[in-house]
Amino acid sequence: MATVDRWLLPDGIEEVLPPEAARIEAARRQVLDLFHRWGYEFVVTPHIEYLESLLTGAGQDLDLRTFKVTDPASGRLMGFRADITPQVARMDAHSLRREGPSRLCYAGSVLHAQPRALSTSRSPIQLGAELYGDPSPASDVEVISLMLEMLEMAEVPDVHMDLGHVGIYRGLARAAGLSGEVEQQLFDALQRKAVDEVEALTADLPAELRGMLRALAELCGGRDALEQGRARLAAAPADVQVALNELIEIADSLAGRFPGLPLYFDLGELRGYHYHTGVVFAAFVPGVGQSIAQGGRYDDIGADFGRARPATGFSTDLKSLVTLGQARLDQAVSGIWAPAEGAGLWQAVQRLRRDGQRVVQALPGQDAASAREAGCDRQLALRDGNWQVAPLAS
């Protein structure tokens, strides 16, 4: 390997230098403190574990994004976590085994074998919150509200929300009795709003059901899209009506809590269709193709760990949150430069550090010129037999 190649990092893998690392850490602490104030308990999941446990209930997409290695100790296949959410769901279902609602949060690096999109990081810092044990829309409203408060605290500008409900399509597909292959083709067509393809794929269905499936490709926009949905899906099965009413209830609650927030609804939005079971949501900012935060309801995942529990939550990439946010997270780099040695110097330095001061002590051979590079704007000087803090000599 040439010397120059030793400095190269793989595509999508980044190192974070000061002061950016300090900004990310400050944001992490602020967000976790926010979660704590809402009653969410912090958990830490393994970076690597056996593949069958890591991917249980997660679907093919996560499998493709997971780096895999063989464990030398057992010979079993292991994976580096690409998504922390399934790990936290396992904690709730298998390790904690609480009967009532459980609020958990997390923050940690994940690793993606494939990026989510072009030019995105393969080593994001995933941060999120999950609420288990309550099936009501009130839980969805809580986690969406927490997500929006997080974005507000980070001062992410011009946020708008996209909301949908996969239960609407699930109910119609179930009523149509679609085969797995046709259901997948119809899913793809709806994501592209390809009305002609939707018409072709549903040509053999009863006219009423065919019309409702086509409507999913057209029911998108502001609050009026929900009212149009009520009218155009009036003959839909009961489970579709329940899903639509849940979405309307959530939308009304959010409009009351965040009256200035732009809300966009898409009844054909099937993000995470093979994973989510209810409402799905994402926050976007203008000029950025990918969502800044996203989540939804995923009630079935706990069953794979022996205990099905209602669940809803969201996640974000902390690096992106800091990049897009305008909050003043810069920590002023200042400190006190102390000489390498001196009578009573150690005691003076320790007193200052206990008081919360940043003190950098010179190493042998270093002079005051090194103080600026170390981020110091003051110095510890011996005057009249006492160590005193003074301005750094220019």
Curated annotation (Swiss-Prot):
It is found in: Cytoplasm. GO terms for biological process: L-histidine biosynthetic process. It holds the Pfam family tRNA-synt_His. The keyword Cytoplasm applies. Signal peptide: none annotated. Pathway: Amino-acid biosynthesis; L-histidine biosynthesis; L-histidine from 5-phospho-alpha-D-ribose 1-diphosphate: step 1/9. Keywords: Amino-acid biosynthesis, Cytoplasm, Histidine biosynthesis. InterPro entries: aa-tRNA-synth_II/BPL/LPL, HisRS-like_core, HisRS/HisZ, HisZ. The keyword Manganese does not apply. GO terms for cellular component: cytoplasm. Its main location: cytoplasm. Gene3D superfamilies: Bira Bifunctional Protein, Domain 2. Heteromultimer composed of HisG and HisZ subunits. This function is generally fulfilled by the C-terminal part of HisG, which is missing in some bacteria such as this one. Belongs to the class-II aminoacyl-tRNA synthetase family. HisZ subfamily. HAMAP family: HisZ (MF_00125). Required for the first step of histidine biosynthesis. May allow the feedback regulation of ATP phosphoribosyltransferase activity by histidine. NCBIfam families: hisZ_biosyn_reg, PRK12292.1-1, PRK12292.1-4, PRK12421.1. This is ATP phosphoribosyltransferase regulatory subunit.
